[in-house]
Amino acid sequence: MNPQRRRRLWLVLALVLAGGLATTLVAMALQRNVAYLYTPSEVLRGDAGAHSRFRLGGMVEKGSFKRASGSLEAQFRVTDGDAQLSVSYDRILPDLFREGQAVVATGRMQHGIFVAEDVLAKHDETYMPKEVADKMGSAHRKHDVPAAAGQVGERQ
């Protein structure tokens, strides 16, 4: 093999290795930033990793909201109809946040409490994120909730 071909071969090998390394790094970064959606039942069953970041979806349980006096820290429970999970949040809650409404919170579990970094409330009375609607719909079917109460996830 002459020297020019050998240099080209090394260049091609270096480019292939650099491309593979870049692809691996991008895939690892994306995997770390992905936050899967779980319901309280799935979290308590252990489906979400013990220290992983994930989204918690469900309804804010009526009568569960408490705010610490003189602080932004709020405590509430999210339910999917089967289980409830306590949530702690120390930032300003969305204007549409209220008990009995759908919510999606992003955060991690710490000592049996979901510590939220971000909380999203549904934005009108008929819409619910599709992932939450699907999971809540299966809970409704399990508990024989009438179809009208389970029709969420689409605009009318």
Swiss-Prot record:
Localization (cell): Cell inner membrane
Recorded superkingdom: Bacteria
Residue ranges of the region described as Disordered: 136-156
SUPFAM superfamilies tied to this protein: Heme chaperone CcmE
Ranges in the topological domain labelled Cytoplasmic: 1-8
Membrane topology, from the record: Single-pass type II membrane protein
Keywords: Cell inner membrane, Cell membrane, Cytochrome c-type biogenesis, Heme, Iron, Membrane, Metal-binding, Signal-anchor, Transmembrane, Transmembrane helix
An example Gene Ontology CC term for this record: plasma membrane
Gene Ontology MF terms in the entry: heme binding; metal ion binding
Pfam families registered for this protein in UniProt: CcmE (PF03100)
Keyword Acyltransferase recorded: no
Binding site for heme: H123, Y127
InterPro entries: CcmE, CcmE-like_sf, NA-bd_OB-fold
Residue stretches spanning the membrane: 9-29
Family: Belongs to the CcmE/CycJ family.
Its biological purpose: Heme chaperone required for the biogenesis of c-type cytochromes. Transiently binds heme delivered by CcmC and transfers the heme to apo-cytochromes in a process facilitated by CcmF and CcmH.
Name assigned to this protein: Cytochrome c-type biogenesis protein CcmE 2
Gene name linked to the record: ccmE2
